UniProtKB/Swiss-Prot annotation:
Annotated metabolic or biological route of this protein: Cofactor biosynthesis; adenosylcobalamin biosynthesis; cob(II)yrinate a,c-diamide from sirohydrochlorin (anaerobic route): step 10/10
Gene transcribed to yield this protein: cbiA
Name assigned to this protein: Cobyrinate a,c-diamide synthase
GO molecular function terms listed in the Swiss-Prot or TrEMBL record: ATP binding; cobyrinic acid a,c-diamide synthase activity
Note: The a and c carboxylates of cobyrinate are activated for nucleophilic attack via formation of a phosphorylated intermediate by ATP. CbiA catalyzes first the amidation of the c-carboxylate, and then that of the a-carboxylate.
Protein source organism: Sulfurisphaera tokodaii (strain DSM 16993 / JCM 10545 / NBRC 100140 / 7)
Functional note: Catalyzes the ATP-dependent amidation of the two carboxylate groups at positions a and c of cobyrinate, using either L-glutamine or ammonia as the nitrogen source.
Domain of life: Archaea
Active-site residues annotated for this sequence: 324 (nucleophile)
Annotated keywords: ATP-binding, Cobalamin biosynthesis, Glutamine amidotransferase, Ligase, Magnesium, Nucleotide-binding
Record's catalysed reaction(s): cob(II)yrinate + 2 L-glutamine + 2 ATP + 2 H2O = cob(II)yrinate a,c diamide + 2 L-glutamate + 2 ADP + 2 phosphate + 2 H(+)
Amino acid sequence: MRFPRIIISSDRSNSGKTIISSALMRVLSRKMKVRGFKAGPDFIDPKYHTLAARVPSINLDLWLMGIEGVKKSLIRYGKGYDIGIIEGVMGLYDGINVNYSTYELSEVTKTPIILVVNCSNVSSTVGAIVKGLKDYRNARIRGVIFNQIGSETHYNYCKSSIKEVQVLGYIKYDRNFSVPSRHLGLFTTEDFKETENVLQSVSKAIEESVDIDKIIEIANSAEELQEVDEAISNDELDTKKGIAAIAYDSAFNFYYSENIDLLRYKYQIEFFSPLLNEKIDNPSLIYVGGGYPELHLNELEKSSSTIRWIKKEAEKGTKILAECGGLMYLSKEIIADKSYKMVNLFDISIKAKDKLTIGYTELDVLSDNILGRKGEVLRGHEFHVSKAINLGNDVKFSMKNRIGKGIWENKDGAIVYNTLASYSHFHFSSARGLLSF
């Protein structure tokens, strides 16, 4: 399959990849059908892509999905689109190891790389940075864009240092081009009200000083992709679709777009808001993902109808999956300035803000649950600042971490009835329980 595409990478985080990738999508979308992708497990950056290109951005994560899973997703979501823009994660060679890096994603998908290099407080040294990144593993670097250029003289110094790849242009320094961050990364597009203005401003800067035609030319040089099997097997299709009730509001909005699409094969999707005290009749599945419940504790404590509904459905045996922020909501209480009472399906007390826990997980399934069977090994990702600080004697765990921290003493996957709650986030291309049984 022919699918023109590029990866936007850098030497480090905080280089401007997200806003430049998103603004480039916006510029290209004026004359092409653009699909955004995000290397790695991030939930926030794809929101910027989605706003920019006006289609959902798709995660490509070698740890969570495996090589074949990544290829399937790239092909599945590239069909019908003129170009794909894949934003890398951290620096080019970073990850749990280089085999799970943006570089490796470029290799397995045969995708050319365009570097974004933050040139603040540096000029000619940029040449050494680019050469080092290219030569370290003979990376498919085909171009470079300079970010935070202070003047034409600054640009010329940087440009003259580059010998081996094309300089595609620059983004001038402007403090209004930045997006603020908080404890889990950039502000989400829902919470940062200036997102659209920033996108428009950076898009204009790209149009003025970046060679868009060259970028398209590089994307067109990407090798063809070999077709692979469908994302879901016939055995996993269910013609009698039940309802999957998915929590979605400012407190709970960390979901992989592909997870929701995969659930559509088996369920009719309906969304509800705990913040608005909503519920959905007769669900076959309730899914409460991550997000920022710690910013909405008062409203969540008052969501009495949603709380009663979730407890009733749990006691009936309805499948319930709660990840990270969802785990917090299903706990006994969240402690911040005071104790806020939650659903209390699990006798767990959660401290709202502690040290940042971030990284991949690998878990042995100790007992059957809605995501896996005993003896299986699941991979996930944890990303939170909260912490379990008290645990009742009756809390049971269905998973044990080989890698990662989990909820308590390297155990994760708290289980009661047919409900599973974890600090790990999962990708359903590999954790297929909700699709298979």
